[in-house]
Design a protein with these regions (language model features):
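Conserved serine/cysteine hydrolase catalytic core
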Residues: 156, 177-254
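The conserved beta1-alpha1 loop
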Residues: 23-27, 95, 120
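Catalytic active-site module of serine/aspartate enzymes centered on a nucleophile-bearing elbow/loop
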Residues: 244-275
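Conserved HGGG/HGGXW glycine-rich cap/lid loop of the alpha/beta-hydrolase fold
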Residues: 9-58, 108
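N-terminal cap/lid segment of alpha/beta-hydrolase-fold proteins
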Residues: 1-10
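Core-facing hydrophobic residues within beta-strands of well-ordered domains
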Residues: 87, 112-113, 256
Length: 275
């Protein structure tokens, strides 16, 4: 376990395994331990770097609103702290919202990127800026303060986490140890962080759309791993379009819910090793 200060905030980092460097970045409101099923399968082949964004997992309280560029730069600082500096290209693996962050890193730091794997990544084809963003941010901050003062994180945080994980899986519950869940999800810092990430989601989608228009990916190897539980193929179609837009390859993990790393960790490993 390592902590590195990034813009004054202690960021929690974990490094396992040996070989070429691979960064695993979790989705909205998730923690480093959500990659636990993947790590033992991947670590014999890769140096696996995991981290928690501010307010999440074991990282310190966020001091600023999240931005796309800021998260890409955070990944760069995490790699520096893990011993993978500018001369050591890494494969970036982003789940859900973190797909935005990892794609942004690949565009802003091409010399540091060996490949890009998007695991059931968020997709916004035509994002629009928020209306009255200052007012929306103020409401988000006030909501977090009110709920924290009322003791909601401690009373309901772990329960809501467990519920969300069950909903995000094809089958099964939350495999994370309860003591880790309680430690990460019973705090006001977590509540403020997840509300901020959700509130700034559209802003980051708009930032990425702008970045795509200005900075190409060139010939970077890209894999889009999409979850499929059966039924409608609308989500698969959106993931396929994303893969085509990035010049990448689409792989399908089935049956799997949105939390592919929990339902089918071997599929995630195969996508990484094949990129």
């Amino acid at each position: 376990m390592t902590f590195v200060r990034i813009l004054g905030v202690p960021n929690h980092i974990r490094v396992d395994g040996t070989g070429p460097v691979c960064v695993l970045s979790a989705g909205l409101g998730m923690a480093w331990f959500d990659w636990d099923p993947v790590v033992p399968l991947l670590a014999p082949h890769r140096t696996v770097v995991r981290f928690d964004r501010p307010g999440l997992g074991l990282s310190g309280h966020a001091r600023a609103w999240p931005t796309l560029t800021g998260e890409a730069e955070r990944i760069a600082r995490v790699l520096d702290a893990a011993g993978a500096g500018a001369g050591v290209p890494a494969t970036l693996v982003g789940h859900s919202l973190a797909g935005f962050h990892c794609e942004a890193f690949a565009r802003l730091f091409p010399e540091r990127t060996a490949g890009l794997v998007l695991v059931d990544s968020s997709v916004e084809e035509a994002p629009r800026p928020r209306r009255a963003p200052e007012f929306a941010d103020a409401c988000t901050r006030a909501c977090g303060t009110l709920l924290s003062t009322a003791g909601v994180p401690r009373a309901l945080g772990p329960f809501l986490r467990r519920t969300a994980v069950r909903a995000g899986r094809h089958t099964g519950g939350d495999p994370a140890p309860y003591d880790l869940v309680r430690r990460a999800y019973s705090t006001s810092r977590f509540l403020h962080a997840v509300l901020a990430e959700n509130g700034r989601y559209r802003d980051q989608a708009v930032e990425l759309a702008s970045l795509r228009g200005r900075v190409p990916l060139d010939t970077l190897p890209v894999t889009v791993l999409a979850a499929y539980e059966g039924g409608s193929r609308h989500w698969l179609d959106r993931q396929r379009v994303l893969a085509e837009r990035l010049g990448g390859v689409l792989r399908v993990s089935a049956p799997a819910g949105h939390l592919v790393m929990l339902d089918r960790p071997q599929d995630v490993v195969d996508a990484i090793l094949g990129t």
